[in-house]
Curated annotation (Swiss-Prot):
Gene behind this protein: gcvH
One GO cellular component, as annotated: cytosol
Role of this protein: The glycine cleavage system catalyzes the degradation of glycine. The H protein shuttles the methylamine group of glycine from the P protein to the T protein.
Assembly and oligomerization: The glycine cleavage system is composed of four proteins: P, T, L and H.
GO BP terms: glycine decarboxylation via glycine cleavage system
Record's protein name: Glycine cleavage system H protein
Lipoyl-binding domain location: 23-105
Cited NCBIfam families: gcvH, PRK01202.1
Record keyword Transmembrane helix present: no
Family label: Belongs to the GcvH family.
């Protein structure tokens, strides 16, 4: 399992892209997607919602369990990926590409985000 080097990671197993015009893309890691099993339902925040780093902002339901989705940063939701709402299996098949979850205009970024190498060591992935 390979964690892209250009991303940063949370200990709740979300990834965060580098900000473009202050907006970053968020998804869950391949490690988290594999642990969940087949994702069958995705509940995302709505455009315009405020999210807080480390707080619940949605839900992922799989054939194994229901898991909370956490925001790795604080900010305002600017876009949600309707493709994963309509086809939740994208979370499993392409967690770092088409399976991204939402975009957020960052107002605060915690200092404890991990590099790819740090996340790999943390997750044992």
């Amino acid at each position: 399992m390979s964690n892209p080097q250009q991303l940063r990671y949370s200990k709740e197993h979300e990834w965060l892209s580098g900000a473009e015009d202050g907006v970053s893309t968020v998804g869950i890691t391949e490690h988290a997607a594999n642990a969940l099993g087949d994702v069958v339902f995705v509940q995302l925040p709505e455009v315009g919602d405020s999210v807080t780093a480390g707080e619940t902002c949605g839900e992922l339901e799989s054939t194994k369990s229901v898991s909370d989705l956490y925001s790795p940063v604080s900010g305002e939701i600017t876009e949600v990926n309707e493709d994963v709402v309509n086809d939740p299996s994208l979370v499993n098949s392409a967690p770092f590409e088409g399976g991204w979850l939402f975009k957020v205009r960052i107002t605060d970024e915690p200092a404890d985000l991990l590099s790819a190498d740090e996340y790999t060591a943390f997750a044992g992935a």
